[in-house]
Amino acid sequence: MSKNIGKIVQVIGAVVDVEFSDGNLPNIFTALEIKNPNNTDAPELICEVAQHLGDNVVRTIAMDATEGLVRGMDAVDTGQPIMVPVGKPSVGRILNVIGRPVDEMGPINAEKYYPIHRPAPAFTDQNTKVELLETGIKVVDLLVPFPKGGKMGLFGGAGVGKTVILMEMINNIAKQHGGSSVFAGVGERTREGNDLYHELKDAGVLERATLVYGQMNEPPGARARVALTALACAEYFRDEEHQDVLLFIDNIFRFTQAGSEVSALLGRMPSAVGYQPTLGTDLGSLQERITSTNTGSITSVQAVYVPADDLTDPAPATTFSHLDGTLVLSRQIAELGIYPAVDPLDSTSRILDPNVVGEEHYAVARRVQMVLQKYKELQDIIAILGMDELSDEDKLTVARARRIQRFLSQPFHVAETFTGTPGQYVNLEDTIKGFKGILDGAYDHMAEGDFYMLGGIEQAVAKYEQRKLQEEN
């Protein structure tokens, strides 16, 4: 079969126009290959068809740098979208947007390749049953439960522990649920991507994760598509291996940002705040594919950058409408030395509902939040007048709140090398039992320090008894 070959007629930054003089135009989203004779070291440049301009010309978005391209060069129609390797051979590897390995560990000999553009699962295939995905992290399971096949936003500044929580979840899902994880680095710093790779490797979690990177230095075409590449990898594990997959996207804002960079080059009129007019569609086509089916699920954790802390900006505002909950990391809590530094009052989850998690879980979670909220309100009085001026009831509330606050901390498996404390995975029943006991006053005789950086409540009791023995001796 003869190849369908076009000629480059115009190059503007990341946008390349190609003419097919015989009128046999490739479809939208088809990949074209361009061999750049001026750069013989580089493999073929992949461009994705974005528009049909008329006069047998298509406008494409380049997935890599376009330096060295000149008019008249051949562009070969591959007849299919960008295809990426999926399945076992891609696990433990770093891929780029077009599925090529970038970790210098040799080629990926995959048996299956998936197109990055795929339809969302049909309504009949989707599983509408709401289930809780146990993460083994006390504060998350109790106050911000993750829905299986849901989407959670992770909000946090620099250095409050976003990456550590992500790594612990990759570790726990792999060990407890036997699931795979896919990490999409969208427009993030190359240094952070490198750090994550080495941290996952050192923690022994790399063999359960696929990393897909399109960093800040990549052209906008790559950054606008790398999340779809990662999603195709995750869909394989869900649909063919019937697994519960975790998909991490860091950062979902950069996906939108890349789309807006390309949009102007494609000649579209900008909409609000200069974003692309197709903002809702672009994000929707990605988010609708992240869902539970009758055979498996993709649960997504998405780091969300909020430009200028303005939550009404179109990019975060559009993202919010897709999220099932928000996990907010707080610098104030990190400064207290409480990790994971999840803000128990700011974080929300759609499934913290008695019909989903059960009456007991819901009641304990709400009581924990009430006690912490009361403590927050009393902090000003304590700072000015001291504890002695509080009523006996308030003193008890403060004492229990401080125990709860410390019991919300937890040593992580992936941080063992730094802390020297063995990581703990806590079952949901143990988490609920522990907090219920603190609220009911069963552990009022114990010191605050007995609850710090532990797993289940039994460990706190054991720590207390050991301390008592030492004091007696």
Swiss-Prot record:
One Pfam family, short name: ATP-synt_ab_N
EC number: 7.1.2.2
Compartment(s): Cell inner membrane
Keyword Cell inner membrane: yes
Membrane topology: Peripheral membrane protein
Enzyme class: translocase
Keywords (A to Z) from UniProt: ATP synthesis, ATP-binding, Cell inner membrane, Cell membrane, CF(1), Hydrogen ion transport, Ion transport, Membrane, Nucleotide-binding, Translocase, Transport
Gene3D superfamilies membership: 2.40.10.170, Bovine Mitochondrial F1-atpase, Atp Synthase Beta Chain, Chain D, domain 3, P-loop containing nucleotide triphosphate hydrolases
Molecular function, one GO term: ATP hydrolysis activity
Binding site for ATP: G156, G157, A158, G159, V160, G161, K162, T163
Entry-linked InterPro entries: AAA+_ATPase (IPR003593), ATP-synt_VA_C (IPR055190), ATP_synth_F1_bsu (IPR005722), ATPase_a/bsu_AS (IPR020003), ATPase_alpha/beta_chains (IPR050053), ATPase_F1/V1/A1_a/bsu_N (IPR004100), ATPase_F1/V1/A1_a/bsu_N_sf (IPR036121), ATPase_F1/V1/A1_a/bsu_nucl-bd (IPR000194)
Principal location: membrane
Highest rank taxon of the organism: Bacteria
Reaction equations catalysed: ATP + H2O + 4 H(+)(in) = ADP + phosphate + 5 H(+)(out)
GO cellular component terms given for this protein: plasma membrane; proton-transporting ATP synthase complex
Physiological role: Produces ATP from ADP in the presence of a proton gradient across the membrane. The catalytic sites are hosted primarily by the beta subunits.
Quaternary structure, from the entry: F-type ATPases have 2 components, CF(1) - the catalytic core - and CF(0) - the membrane proton channel. CF(1) has five subunits: alpha(3), beta(3), gamma(1), delta(1), epsilon(1). CF(0) has three main subunits: a(1), b(2) and c(9-12). The alpha and beta chains form an alternating ring which encloses part of the gamma chain. CF(1) is attached to CF(0) by a central stalk formed by the gamma and epsilon chains, while a peripheral stalk is formed by the delta and b chains.
Family note: Belongs to the ATPase alpha/beta chains family.
Protein's name according to its UniProt entry: ATP synthase subunit beta
The organism of origin for this protein: Desulfovibrio desulfuricans (strain ATCC 27774 / DSM 6949 / MB)
The gene coding this protein: atpD
